[in-house]
Amino acid sequence: DAMWEDENEFCKESIFESNQLPEGKSWGNAWSGYGTNLPAFISPADLKDPDGIFKGGWGFGPVRQAAYDMYEQGDKRRDGSINKWDDGLYTPRFQNTGLFQRKYAARVGYNPPPGDVDLNYCNNLRIFRYAETLLNYVELVKMHGQSEVDGVNAQACLDQIRERAGVSPIQPTEENIKLERRREFLGEGMRFWDLVRWGDAPTLLTENEPAHNSVRTFEEWMKYLPIPQGEMEKTKGTEFELKQNGNWK
């Protein structure tokens, strides 16, 4: 959890970050400064934190109970990734579960004036972490058949991740590798791309869950971006004529 605090930006576990600076951004001047509004998006509305650490936001992107439950007993990443707020401490919004993302949550003192406070948080976005290096290596070796490099053992890499989280070692099976990435990177924007890369998106991103007001379908062709119409027009009638990806219109 400490890695996501302001004083630990650019620490040894964080290889590359997008630096966010609260420099007076406002609704009328969105290009002023480099503050981020992500903390406002994902924090519960009208939050009253008894400990005075976290602030309220707009209440988007609540965490599902299944994500909270996927962590093993004693896994420090659960409470470092998810805030669980009691009823009465915030105003429920769409798809409310009482669970919210913690890593980039709105924190007291992270959005000083001037400018609009919701647009000026200084939470740096961690783009690439050491943990991703380890789990990428494990996946390449165990799921994609690549040879180990310079004697670096895939099991040992996975053990590093698990030891830091305070849980026992597990075997680097495909199922375990996928689950470990989900646990490690919750709330960091990795999950969608992992599912697409593994070919799991059509299954796991297609659902009909009235409890979450979620009805959606994901098909294989959707992993490709649509080609802009203007670009296709430029090549029309040539030997290099562009054709639209999938069923994009």
Model-derived regions, located:
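Long, intrinsically disordered, low-complexity segments
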Residues: 3-53, 120, 125, 162, ...
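Extended, hydrophobic/aromatic-rich amphipathic alpha-helical segments that build helical scaffolds
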Residues: 16, 75, 79, 124-161, ...
